[in-house]
Amino acid sequence: MSTGTVVQVIGAVVDVEFPHDAVPQVYDALEIKSEGLVLEVQQQLGGGVVRTIAMGSSDGLRRGIEVVNTGSPITVPVGSATLGRIMNVLGQPVDEAGPIGEDERYVIHREAPSYEDQSNTTELLETGIKVIDLVCPFAKGGKVGLFGGAGVGKTVNMMELINNIAKAHSGLSVFAGVGERTREGNDFYYEMEESGVLDKVAMVYGQMNEPPGNRLRVALTGLTMAEKFRDEGKDVLLFVDNIYRYTLAGTEVSALLGRMPSAVGYQPTLAEEMGVLQERITSTKTGSITSVQAVYVPADDLTDPSPATTFAHLDATVVLSRNIASLGIYPAVDPLDSTSRQLDPQVVGQEHYDVASGVQNVLQRYKELKDIIAILGMDELSDEDKTTVARARKIEKYLSQPFFVAEVFTGSPGKYVALKDTIRGFKGLLEGEFDHIPEQAFYMAGSIDEVIERANKK
């Protein structure tokens, strides 16, 4: 193990000088024992100097401090010892429950599985959320993105998915909190504890208040733990909240590393950094990783380079809309913008496909008629269009649903709707079976039976 000295500190970026014959490799972990700080090598600048990112606060560092090269990249504990624990980017416990007691450690920088090892699946994963199961169904072993601006419900939707899938699914889950609020991580921990599934979840947090190095690498730490479970032949759920903060952390250190910024100030290596992470989130012939990732959309602009780069890697995209949220319809999923590769008659079946397409057609027609209604009013529409508008408004209302995780805010109990009930309800709406029921009966309802019951009470 060679030793060097700190020669420059610029925020999260630290330059360290080593003897010329013992320069560390890129991604090697260096340790400053006096400060208890780990650095990760990013560049070799020549003359024995390496440029590193600090995996913690660089406050109090000064030139001349001794740095030790560990000789390998950052390693984190993996396996069953991580379940029920909260760890930081280095795999150190932060839940005050004693040491992890790991049997094995993995390096966080690993190759993606080779093509012949990867497997594709068409098995559907039921979520119990009507709008998702209908228009953008998830695949087991697939990658899903929840796209939305600030405050439209990404985290609440993700928590509901965790509630519905992780509890029903007997497998293991890994939750990577990347640059999000500490409060949300705290709530998540207690929620898992209350529901009795804490012993099946490993949690890795690098919150908003942490230096960019932590936020840049914490997603890889969580992914490494998920890969271990997958390689043991298990089916794993990987939740990442929020993938945008991963990009943002890269942007924060990019300029300090001396790279020229690209579009909108993002790092020039944006696509490559996203690819390195996303290509590893995949299912193999031994086990599967099903990932759900929240993606913040800056200024509600889906063409921003960060969300646009993420789109390319996903099997299903759930787009949350501010306009739908402003109507009071939650989950605020846009059924016209959300897509899924699974929405194919050969995968979901002809009936499901026809109902989903029918719902989208009716909503699209309503969208086109809104301008005419705003200018001329409903009376100028043909009878056929009036029927379409009435059904579209009922469909819009019926796409809302009370969530289990929002019970404390809404006061109404959460509802889980099975896929067959979802299809039956929307099929009836399209065929005019429920034209006699007032649209208010459809708002925040579970299955169609509940809607009929409400209408009969009135």
UniProtKB/Swiss-Prot annotation:
Q: Which domain of life is it from?
A: Bacteria
E.C. no: 7.1.2.2
Protein's membrane topology: Peripheral membrane protein
Listed GO molecular functions? ATP binding; ATP hydrolysis activity; proton-transporting ATP synthase activity, rotational mechanism
Do you know which Pfam families this protein is assigned to? ATP-synt_ab, ATP-synt_ab_N, ATP-synt_VA_C
Q: Which InterPro entries match?
A: AAA+_ATPase, ATP-synt_VA_C, ATP_synth_F1_bsu, ATPase_a/bsu_AS, ATPase_alpha/beta_chains, ATPase_F1/V1/A1_a/bsu_N, ATPase_F1/V1/A1_a/bsu_N_sf, ATPase_F1/V1/A1_a/bsu_nucl-bd
Give me the Gene Ontology terms describing cellular component: plasma membrane; proton-transporting ATP synthase complex
Alphabetized, the UniProt keywords read: ATP synthesis, ATP-binding, Cell inner membrane, Cell membrane, CF(1), Hydrogen ion transport, Ion transport, Membrane, Nucleotide-binding, Translocase, Transport
Recorded catalytic reaction(s): these are:
ATP + H2O + 4 H(+)(in) = ADP + phosphate + 5 H(+)(out)
In which residues is ATP bound? 148-155
- Report the locations given in the UniProt record: Cell inner membrane
Q: What does this protein do?
A: Produces ATP from ADP in the presence of a proton gradient across the membrane. The catalytic sites are hosted primarily by the beta subunits.
Summary of subunit composition and partner proteins: F-type ATPases have 2 components, CF(1) - the catalytic core - and CF(0) - the membrane proton channel. CF(1) has five subunits: alpha(3), beta(3), gamma(1), delta(1), epsilon(1). CF(0) has three main subunits: a(1), b(2) and c(9-12). The alpha and beta chains form an alternating ring which encloses part of the gamma chain. CF(1) is attached to CF(0) by a central stalk formed by the gamma and epsilon chains, while a peripheral stalk is formed by the delta and b chains.
What family does the database annotate? Belongs to the ATPase alpha/beta chains family.
Write the protein's name: ATP synthase subunit beta
Species in which this protein is naturally found? Shewanella loihica (strain ATCC BAA-1088 / PV-4)
**Which gene is transcribed and translated to give this protein?**
atpD
